[in-house]
Amino acid sequence: MSPTDGSARRDFEKALDIGRPPNIARLFPNSKALIVSGKVIDRAMIAKGGAIAIAANGRNHLVIRGALLAAHRANSPIIIEIAKSEGGANAYCAVNYWNIARQVDALCNELGITVPVAVHADHYGIKSTKDVEAAKVEIPTMFDAGITSIAVDASHLPDDENLLASIALHPLIPPWAGYETEVGEIKGSQGISTVEEALFLIQGLNAHDIFPDWIALNNGTTHGIQDSEAGIQVELTAEIHEALTRYEVSGAQHGTSGNDSDRLRRIAAETRTTKANVATALQMITWGVEVNEYGNARLDENGRFVKRSDQGVTDELWEEMVAYAVEKGWKSGDYKKLNLPFENKLLSQPREIRERMTEGVASFVYSLITEVFNAGNAAPLATEAILEAGSYDLGPKGSRIEDPADWTEERIRGRASSIERDRGPAGDFED
């Protein structure tokens, strides 16, 4: 929906003038795309109440295209994101941290998208001291390339190392940018996050004048294709969010694909979640793989994906993709690795095929926005947040409550040693 009336048009033009962060204004000086900080999206969802913004993982160009069209039709702000495993230095997608903002900006201008869009670096994983040092070089380059929000994910580390890594890297993040932190690596029903460790992370950050916009938890979901009906633990999520109330941090829901609509509606209504990541389902839809209401790809009796001939890529290209995966010895969960070698082949499909790939994503995301996450018609609230602030920088929601003297490195390590934590099984749980 375009801001066609005079007042809405003036608000949009003013937001374009003052609401685009410095990196975006520098990269795209003549753009009509309203690319904003992740903070803007969070504040719009808070203002609407019981609403969650879609964070669409753009594993291919047509996912980004479809998600932006859906947001525009729903008049909803949206987050377009890519994770380190998907789009970092050693990625399995052609879309990456350094080109995603350029794709978003180009598509917004091409398609006439007039809703606010944040560009988020999801799951910037930190697994070692070596990763911290590499991040000190890499993170600034991502903001140079147009990222406007980031999730620093050191949840793979012990609680004290997670906190200390987050503190060490925070000076690299522009103060205007959206910021997400994470506790409890996403592992499904094992290694579930607790109130104690969530408080430890948020209190420690608070003592160092770091005020996250979002916290992600392991609240029962997994990345990729779900193989159980367990899913999100709504009550646990609400309990943790309630414990964090005074720190004014919203929730970020990971592993959304594979959870039924009623459970997702409860997350919107009963918790403080304002961001929900959707990745695997959108990838599958562009390919034409049949997806159920949960966003799970359907498998036949032989464990193979069910491809619909009237959706996604041509049957000929799908057969080529399957043959490539078989040659590599990939199981169903590895099919995500097809994104990089097949991106150009996706883009070289006939126009009518590309359009149905895009429209499949647009239809799915539109339904999530309007029928599940209560985020329809929230775009004016995002614009309003910019105009009220008079700036691209909305500032933090929280303020310092904790005493820094209680959160020195020595005391952080001492506190962490008393936390009882089930880390769950070892292994690679990234997607």
Which residues does each predicted region cover?
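Catalytic alpha/beta core domains of metabolic enzymes, predominantly
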Residues: G204-T314
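C-terminal extensions of enzymes
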Residues: S2-R26, Y324-D431
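Short gly/pro/ser/thr-enriched loop/turn and capping motifs at secondary-structure boundaries
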Residues: G87-G88, L157-P158, L282-W287
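Glycine-rich beta-to-alpha transition loops that act as phosphate-gripper elements at the mouths
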Residues: N57-G58, H120-K127, E185, S250-N259
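Alpha/beta enzyme core
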Residues: K39-I46, H61-E86, V95-R102, A106-T114, ...
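N-terminal capping/small domains of soluble enzymes
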Residues: S2-N96
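C-terminal helical cap(s) of enzyme catalytic domains, especially alpha/beta-barrels
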Residues: D160-P174, I225-Q226, T286-K307, T358-I369, ...
